[in-house]
Amino acid sequence: MLTKEFHEVISHEGIVSIVSWAKVEPHVVNTWNSYLIIPDDKTILIPAAGMRKTQANTEVNSRVKLTVGSKEAQGKKMGRGFLIEGNAEFLPSGPLYDQMKAKCPFTSRVLVVTVSSIEKTL
């Protein structure tokens, strides 16, 4: 599901936007492409140092939307990007947390996104 083209995009620095929602308006938080870990073709690991509102939202509604992109990854024009949808869970410990903590020592939890769809947007 997470294609070679997706991996090419996240190999360049760019911003990742994470959208979550519960009963009220959507909440958006950002991180960087370089912080992501992709352990398999349907899972994205994201370090969470803050993200308290995102976590509260996912405890009510686990669905999230992410956008990732980089102007350095050439597509038909300058840059490429993707819209990713999936389900999210925050983990404060365990093997996935340990993997993220080794890469991003500032993290207090790992946001695990199980991807259900991916669409090229740029």
Regions inferred by a protein language model and the residue ranges of each:
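Binding-site signature for planar aromatic cofactors or substrates
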Residues: 1-122
